[in-house]
Each structure stands twice: as structure tokens, then as C-alpha cells.
């Protein structure tokens, strides 16, 4: 009899769902993500506006780093990987170098980086936004072009950060519809 009672308890517990406020974090974040998406992008844009003029003045190059092919990757099947790789690119390569170009912007760049990290964390919690494995050739091209520009690459990449935010928004909008 004790084993059947244990089996009954296990079946009962398996059917019990958590109350409304007790969903696992990732499921809750996925449910509320459409609401927070607009807020996160607004915060990213506001943080970027604090450093945008600095980098626009320093960027003397006519070429575009974040090309149409990258934007197409964001809208296509490689969108997940392009987003993931570009966030990593800005956090690991661009922003640390950018901090060295002006102590007056370091605090604002740190704030921008933290907001980007928060976005990445929220995207990862809701697996349908970052379920990716493949590499994006467009991101590789951006990285190669960035490295070829040497010191000027930082100015170019930071000057085009608003294009990156627009790519993030386009990607998330597509994912919200699917």
C-alpha cells in the first residue's frame, strides 16, 4: 500500500501547476517580453545618445561597417546567430577599445554595455529568441572590416551603434510575430 500511495502523490504533484506569480523565470520573461522589448530598446537608444555625438565627430570614414547584408542576416534564418555574435562583438571588441578613447565617455559606455548585457541575458532566458548554432558570414565580414580599420574601427562601430539597435529591433519584431 505505501508504494501505491507514493505513486498517487507523484502523479498528483506532476499535475500541479505553479500559481500565477511562481512560473520559472524564463517562462515569465517570455510572457512579458513583448512589453519589456520596447522599454529595453528605448533604454539602449537613450544610453547611446549620451556618446553618439562623440563618436560621430571622430568617425571620418565614408564606408559603412554594418552593411545591408548584416541587416538581411538579422531578418533571415541567421538572425539569431547574427544578433548573438554582434552583441558579443560590441561587448568584447568594440566597447573596451572605445573606453580608451575618452575618459569623459567611459561611464556612459559602461552604462550602454550593461544595458546590452541585460538585453542579451533576457534574450537567452526566453530561448525562442536565441536558439541558434550557425555562424553569420555578414558578422564575420563586419569583424574583418573593423579590424582592417584599426583605431578608426572603434569610431565607425560606435557611430553605427544605432544601426545595430535597429537590427535588434527588426529581429525581435520578427520573432514576436512567429
Curated annotation (Swiss-Prot):
Signal sequence interval, chain numbering: 1-18
Oxidoreductase found in the keyword field: no
Superkingdom of the organism of origin: Eukaryota
Record flagged with keyword Signal: yes
Any one Pfam family match given in the protein's UniProt record, by short name: IL10
PROSITE patterns reported for this sequence: INTERLEUKIN_10
Keywords annotated in UniProt: Cytokine, Disulfide bond, Glycoprotein, Secreted, Signal
Sugar attachment sites: 134
Entry-linked InterPro entries: 4_helix_cytokine-like_core (IPR009079), IL-10 (IPR000098), IL-10/19/20/24/26 (IPR020443), IL-10_CS (IPR020423)
Gene3D superfamilies for the chain: 1.20.1250.10
Disulfide bridges in this chain: 30-126, 80-132
GO biological process, alphabetically ordered: immune response; negative regulation of B cell proliferation; negative regulation of cytokine production involved in immune response; negative regulation of inflammatory response; negative regulation of interleukin-6 production; negative regulation of membrane protein ectodomain proteolysis; positive regulation of B cell apoptotic process; positive regulation of cytokine production
Subcellular location: Secreted
Function, as annotated: Major immune regulatory cytokine that acts on many cells of the immune system where it has profound anti-inflammatory functions, limiting excessive tissue disruption caused by inflammation. Mechanistically, IL10 binds to its heterotetrameric receptor comprising IL10RA and IL10RB leading to JAK1 and STAT2-mediated phosphorylation of STAT3. In turn, STAT3 translocates to the nucleus where it drives expression of anti-inflammatory mediators.
Oligomer and partners: Homodimer. Interacts with IL10RA and IL10RB.
Family statement drawn from the similarity comment of this UniProt entry: Belongs to the IL-10 family.
Entry protein name: Interleukin-10
Designated gene of the protein: IL10
